[in-house]
């Protein structure tokens, strides 16, 4: 089927979490009610959860089962390689050099946050 086959997303919601909640802020799009499958889509450095919203109607086909697309926002943090500018990033990037020290703490925190999202989807009936 060609892109844009009319399978427009049916529901839109934005979930903002209080600071004490370890769950990331997300944008969620459902193709129909009662989704049994989820796609968790991470954005890149400096982008945000809204960046991939427009592509969903181009990806979805009418004959597909109901889907939930979950677009989490990475935390805003200083990014060393960008002069310490605060932007959305899953972890700090120390430099462009492959030998640069990796932000293990930030990487592990992002892994934990994504695992929390995956668990939440399971609690919502996604197997």
Label every model-predicted segment.
Residues 2-3, 10, 14-126:
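Serine-hydrolase catalytic machinery in alpha/beta-hydrolase-like enzymes
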